[in-house]
């Protein structure tokens, strides 16, 4: 629950948090709260400063750049595999995912919209036998997830949906070059909005 609140920006970057407040919020004892704080500190989602307190970490664009570099390296291989391995049933599942995304977007359901996005990418990795790769990505994606929340809540996401649709078309056509090209285009859409978010949410980002 604490990680969910951090990722979804219900707790803002820079906010001070205390064990007592979290115990009251979640209705649990200090021990699991303390353990969660230490784990999230290791994941760079919480900053701990002796004699100052515990704070929600700022969004680190350098860390996100490094994460996206790793993701692009993995997706170069995964998109190639998807063009070889995905069955008609796999393709149908991905197309239904896109339909569901559009439905949730129309109903302004941000949580389910983001869930569809995550499921789309996870499904491709798993269908290609790369569950472990996907786990590595998810374990390091929390900083990036906050950018996704900003993107989904403030930017028209029609182009993101089109990327997914075009990607499925490329998989179905076994067009490896096109699939990877679309994957890179998809990632760049988030990077393109960094400067806009820095202006709109200056207090969210690491200086």
Identify what each model region corresponds to:
Residues 67, 84-149, 160-169, 178-189:
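Conserved amphipathic alpha-helical segments that form helical-bundle/coiled-coil interaction surfaces
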